[in-house]
């Protein structure tokens, strides 16, 4: 073994000085510098910092429920009475396989579709929900476009529809308000053109008849408080022009539109507490919370501003004053004396009886025409459509009223506003007077004379006889050559 070690040791020492080197060559394709130049030339987008004061719309992809967002809205979270400032565009982010219903003619844009999907994945279908009920109760037909896709996408919805049947020619501005139904409360929509967008698999939309009279429950409570008569009280909602309302129940999301102005808030939310009352014009009432389809008659009463009946009050006051005077003057009750009637006394008695009968006749007419007076007074003063709502309720009010029909005058006024300037400068005001005196038109000829001292002189005349005489006189006097060239 020792002999083998002698031979192995020098070999190991030599191997330790040997190093193995491996050469690896990497081939790389040459980069052409013109590619970047071509990309910069054909670039069609810019960085977001270059676009200012414009809200960016991004399509969301990880969604389970639709998202409604009113663009440009502000809300007062701390106040009990909150308002949504007017905005005419609604942005909706829709998850896959969730249908959304949009009023026909209100779709602005479909975006948020990238390379993972295509526009062909969005399916559209036109539907007319509650066709016969809306035609009978409201006298109108509303078409809704159903959109559904297997991939997420986003929408932009306008508050005004472009179709004529849905108020496309309306001159009033509209704005959005969003409602979330969680199944605990229902909403009664009183404006037929308010429902713009809705979604929800368990959302129920039905049409019901507006109640004409209040319920027995409400009438009993009013009798206990005011001791009123047994006459049936009206709700003030029913009319032959408008006989129905839309009931929203279940779970889902709704986008309502109300009439107003873009310069300020147009839809307001009012929260009524228990036994709290409010007077509202029924045309401005957009929606109200209810508990089922038969709850409107439990909270709404027609209101008429009362008229003070001066004749009855004066008669009652006079009778009471006479009674008090007789009691004060006569401490002791005096028995009436029997007097033999004369013919004159009989005549006076008959006149008094006729006078009393005439008074009773006019009091009877005044009593039964008081209702006619109040209705005519409220109609002339513009208060004939007021209703009283008793809480607890949530109300949505719109600041303007939409008048249906073609309005050519407003369109003509808008055209005039676009032609004529909206502001006038009061500092620099100049008045021009037009001379209406008749004058006969004349033909004038222009000519130029070249003189060595003055140069070219331009003149206009209707007759060359005078100019020729002056030129000849100058030739005789000065003896200079004057060249005249007509134009």
Curated annotation (Swiss-Prot):
Keywords tagged on the record: Mitochondrion, Transit peptide
Name the Pfam families for this protein.
Answer: AIM24
The transit peptide spans 1-62
Chief subcellular location: mitochondrion
List the subcellular locations. Mitochondrion
Q: What processes in GO biological process is this protein linked to?
A: inner mitochondrial membrane organization
> Which cellular component, as a GO term, is one annotated location?
mitochondrial inner membrane
Indicate the family of this protein. Belongs to the AIM24 family.
Protein's UniProt name: Altered inheritance of mitochondria protein 24, mitochondrial
Tell me the organism. Candida dubliniensis (strain CD36 / ATCC MYA-646 / CBS 7987 / NCPF 3949 / NRRL Y-17841)
What gene makes this protein? AIM24
